[in-house]
Amino acid sequence: VVRDDSIIFWKNYKEFTPDTKVYVASAGKWVAAAVIGAVVDRTDLDWNDNVKKWIPEFKNDVKGMITLRQLLSHTSGVRPYLPEPRVDNYNQLDSAVMEILPLDTVFTPGTRFEYGGLAMQIAGRMAEKAMNKEFEELFQKLIARPLGMKSSHFTPVNTDGGHAPMLGGGLCTTLHDYMRFLDMIYHNGVFEEKQILKPETIHEMQADQVGN
């Protein structure tokens, strides 16, 4: 429990400590979104950019008109998860995104909200293209190292046969590391007097994206 930037209470149970590395599932979604926000801060990538601008393979597909904003706000129409049975045998987001390309949308982009993680793979690939770096490298350079998150990374849950970074559920971190991220969010993008994310990016991350 933190109050006024000071820990006033903490307790751990059994083998779990503040330094135990765990997968935090969907609690990593906004960490991935922060990485993408940091790319928006530094490049021509914009929240309202269409997918096809950065991934030309989508130019003749309805999903090519989906915006980065829709991908990250669960309003894109991209199905929530890959259909079963399906095995992701790809090590990179570029290959993983090509698995999404032939899948039909489940609703017209921008007309509904449906929670899921698959759309974030496309968003991550847009960020990769904008900075010409792989997503894990972006995370380490733009978020993890500036925050001192030394034990955190996006990694495969199962490495058998390879696996692309899971932006919607693949963050492995510790309580200490995660608190550093939360501290930055709470202080409007600032951590230890360093501006990690622009205030307007924090605002976009927390704004109502559906309107109803």
Language-model features, listed with the residues they occupy:
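Solvent-exposed loop and edge beta-strand segments that line ligand/cofactor-binding
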Residues: 24, 109-113, 164-172
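Active-site helix/loop module of the DD-peptidase/beta-lactamase fold
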Residues: 18, 23, 27, 41-79, ...
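Catalytic nucleophile serine of serine hydrolases
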Residues: 26-27, 114-119
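Short, solvent-exposed loop/turn and secondary-structure capping segments
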Residues: 12, 82-86
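Active/ligand-binding-proximal structured segments within catalytic/core domains
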Residues: 31-32
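Coil residues (strongly favoring Ser/Thr
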Residues: 5-6, 20, 95, 105
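Active-site-proximal alpha-helical segments within enzyme catalytic domains
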Residues: 74, 119-126, 165-191, 200-209
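A short, well-structured edge-of-sheet supersecondary motif
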Residues: 1-17, 47, 148-150
